[in-house]
């Protein structure tokens, strides 16, 4: 199944963007070529940009604390798997502790490292990181791959608590919903929300329907899923077919 996700608010949108960026960082960090490690470094810059737009650390701590308080009373419920519950609460508490021990904001990493700041200022310019622009960076790229990787890991380490906290919140959110089979009649589906508040919509599409692309939108009253196809020039065009998919609405 192919999963498409749509966030209902800016906070979840930010967490999804961070998740995507951290996954990208993992991939390029595991590669060997200097250009791939260049992408890893610029991805760290993007993570700092996204995380620095709001007081994300405080928001994550508040949300994790709210989830911990909601789960704590379940310890006396015999119908709940207590081992699984304790594991989740322990993970939440570890996330809160890691975030609480993090000093400063995400952007502090750049403020404390002039060398990285110089790379970032050039990286926003097309072709701005050539060897004649940043000879020290060019020399660094010729180091052994393991040495470069160790440096990047060191620079990314201050962001680990944000990744941990965001990952816990997103996993709990995704596990909060139940999926149901629906059909987009004539390529379109809409559903009244009846006053219920959601934070994330998931659309699961069978891989045999890869040609159909869901475009999702929502407000506090209704959600829409409209399927399109791309023509030879990759332009979207409407679909008239009935398309089955799984819909999952998630909310804490």
From Swiss-Prot:
Name of the molecule in the record: Cell division protein ZapD
| GO cellular component terms, semicolon-separated | cell division site; cytoplasm
Q: Which SUPFAM superfamilies match?
A: YacF-like (SSF160950)
Q: Taxonomically, which superkingdom?
A: Bacteria
Which Gene Ontology BP annotations are present?
Answer: division septum assembly; FtsZ-dependent cytokinesis
Protein source organism = Cupriavidus metallidurans (strain ATCC 43123 / DSM 2839 / NBRC 102507 / CH34)
Keyword presence, Cell division: yes
What coarse category fits the chief subcellular location reported for this protein? cytoplasm
Alphabetically ordered keywords of this record: Cell cycle, Cell division, Cytoplasm, Septation
What does the similarity note say? Belongs to the ZapD family.
What job does the chain carry out? Cell division factor that enhances FtsZ-ring assembly. Directly interacts with FtsZ and promotes bundling of FtsZ protofilaments, with a reduction in FtsZ GTPase activity.
| Protein localization | Cytoplasm
Quaternary structure annotation from Swiss-Prot or TrEMBL: Interacts with FtsZ.
């Amino acid at each position: 199944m192919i999963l498409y996700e749509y966030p209902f608010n800016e906070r979840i949108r930010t967490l999804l963007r961070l998740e995507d960026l951290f996954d990208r960082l993992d991939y390029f960090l595991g590669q060997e070529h200097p250009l791939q490690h260049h992408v890893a470094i610029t991805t760290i810059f993007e993570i700092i940009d996204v995380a620095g737009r709001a007081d994300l650390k405080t928001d994550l701590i508040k949300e994790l604390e709210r989830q911990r308080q909601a789960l704590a009373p379940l310890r006396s419920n015999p119908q709940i798997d207590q081992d699984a519950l304790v594991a989740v609460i322990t993970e939440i508490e570890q996330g809160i502790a890691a975030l609480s021990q993090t000093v400063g904001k995400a952007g502090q990493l750049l403020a404390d490292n002039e060398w990285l700041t110089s790379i970032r200022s050039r990286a926003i310019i097309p072709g701005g990181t050539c060897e004649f622009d940043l000879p020290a960076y060019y020399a660094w790229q010729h180091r052994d791959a393991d040495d470069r990787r160790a440096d990047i890991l060191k620079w990314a380490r201050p962001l680990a608590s944000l990744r941990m906290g965001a990952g816990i919140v997103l996993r709990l959110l995704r596990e909060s919903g139940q999926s149901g089979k629906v059909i987009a009649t004539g390529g379109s589906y809409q559903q009244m929300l009846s006053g219920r508040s959601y934070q994330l919509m998931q659309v699961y599409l069978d891989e045999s329907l890869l040609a159909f692309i869901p475009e999702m939108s929502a407000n506090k009253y209704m959600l829409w899923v409209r399927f399109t196809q791309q023509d030879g020039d990759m332009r979207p065009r409407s679909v008239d077919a009935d398309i089955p998919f799984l819909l999952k609405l998630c909310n804490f």
